[in-house]
């Protein structure tokens, strides 16, 4: 036995054995390799000093976008969990259960200082609030939940959020992050591509703005549908936006791709993305865009507080005096 153990009181042994330091206290920057204190990252919305934009949770997206960090959660419909009875090395319901547990643990950590849990059931989370005073429905895709894959639950969430934007005459903002369609749902997942497109058409018919914030990564069936159908496309720096990944393309064509291929800056140069915006300036940019696309007179939620200037009226001219003929 070590001599230190002989002289150390039992209570002190217990204190020394406890692991008080969290495992995720430090985060490595993918761009520079620098270790960054997590609290410092939270202050900068998870943008590293080297400019790398790390993936963030739906709750943090809402905090970034909504005025005063206040929003109204939107209840999303339930869908059949395993219509195809799909199974690979583990059953699909088991994968869903593990993904929900992972997200729940993250949500508990994020609400330690207060706040209600999001009660997230799949990769989509929706909320209603104001961005720069403009009423908006915001739908966030969570890559941590099975790679943000598009399935029936995500499709129903998108349609529900779009219909709420229609009902409230508000803007619709979607933050995408996905590896594509969910293979465990087969053709049922591919069906969500045209279904979400029809929901976007309804917004266009109502002349309501649909703004897409492309985050890393946005790929597969998501990039081939609602991610690239916005009125305005805003992308975060360095985000991969593609249908197939660069490695798959290189193996297919047996050629090297240009530097930065399929990154947001490359797509902006080619005209597929309107603007690339640092996350710390995202809210101001989205608010400015919505302010142009959704005129004040059409914001239903603000009509009771609008200071409308009454139309100018002209007083009727007094009748000309009748002149008696001489």
UniProtKB/Swiss-Prot annotation:
Q: Supply the alphabetized keyword list.
A: ATP-binding, Cytoplasm, Fatty acid biosynthesis, Fatty acid metabolism, Lipid biosynthesis, Lipid metabolism, Nucleotide-binding, Transferase
Question: Record's GO cellular component, any one?
Answer: acetate CoA-transferase complex
UniProt key word Lipid metabolism: yes
Q: What catalytic activity is recorded?
A: N(6)-carboxybiotinyl-L-lysyl-[protein] + acetyl-CoA = N(6)-biotinyl-L-lysyl-[protein] + malonyl-CoA
Q: Where in the cell is it found?
A: Cytoplasm
Task: Enumerate composition-biased segments (Basic and acidic residues).
Answer: 317-326
Q: Where is the CoA carboxyltransferase N-terminal domain positioned along the sequence? A: 25-308
Q: Which GO terms describe its biological process?
A: fatty acid biosynthetic process; malonyl-CoA biosynthetic process
Specify the pathway: Lipid metabolism; malonyl-CoA biosynthesis; malonyl-CoA from acetyl-CoA: step 1/1
* Region spans: Disordered: 298-326
The family classification in the record reads: Belongs to the AccD/PCCB family.
Quaternary structure, per UniProt, is: Acetyl-CoA carboxylase is a heterohexamer composed of biotin carboxyl carrier protein (AccB), biotin carboxylase (AccC) and two subunits each of ACCase subunit alpha (AccA) and ACCase subunit beta (AccD).
Q: This chain belongs to which protein, by name?
A: Acetyl-coenzyme A carboxylase carboxyl transferase subunit beta
Q: What is the lineage of its organism?
A: Bacteria, Pseudomonadati, Pseudomonadota, Alphaproteobacteria, Hyphomonadales
């Amino acid at each position: 036995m070590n001599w230190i153990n002989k002289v150390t009181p039992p209570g002190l042994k217990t204190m020394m054995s406890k692991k008080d330091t969290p495992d995720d206290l430090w985060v490595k920057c993918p761009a520079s390799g620098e270790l960054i204190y997590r609290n410092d990252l939270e202050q900068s919305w998870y943008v590293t000093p080297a400019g790398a934009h790390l993936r963030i949770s739906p709750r943090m997206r809402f905090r970034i976008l909504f005025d005063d960090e206040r929003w109204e959660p939107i209840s999303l419909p339930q869908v059949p969990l395993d219509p195809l009875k799909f199974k690979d090395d583990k059953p699909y319901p088991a994968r869903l259960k593990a993904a929900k547990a992972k997200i729940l643990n993250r949500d508990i950590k994020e609400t330690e200082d207060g706040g209600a849990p999001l009660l997230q059931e799949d990769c989509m989370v929706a909320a209603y609030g104001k961005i720069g005073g403009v009423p908006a429905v915001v739908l966030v895709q969570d890559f941590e939940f099975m790679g943000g894959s598009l399935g029936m639950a995500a499709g129903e969430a998108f349609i529900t959020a779009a219909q709420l934007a229609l009902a409230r005459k508000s803007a619709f903002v979607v933050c995408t992050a996905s590896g594509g369609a969910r293979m465990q749902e087969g053709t049922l997942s591919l069906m969500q591509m045209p279904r979400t497109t029809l929901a976007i058409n309804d917004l266009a018919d109502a002349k309501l703005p649909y703004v897409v914030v492309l985050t890393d990564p946005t790929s597969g069936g998501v990039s081939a549908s609602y991610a690239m159908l916005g009125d305005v496309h805003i992308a975060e720096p360095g985000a991969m936006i593609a249908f197939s990944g660069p490695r798959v393309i290189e193996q297919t064509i047996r050629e090297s791709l240009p530097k930065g291929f399929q990154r947001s800056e490359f797509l902006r140069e080619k005209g597929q993305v309107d603007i690339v915006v640092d996350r710390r300036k995202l809210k101001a940019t989205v608010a400015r865009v919505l302010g142009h696309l959704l005129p004040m007179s059409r914001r239903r939620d603000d009509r009771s507080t609008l200071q409308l200037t009454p139309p100018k009226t002209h007083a009727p001219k007094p009748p000309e005096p009748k002149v008696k003929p001489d």
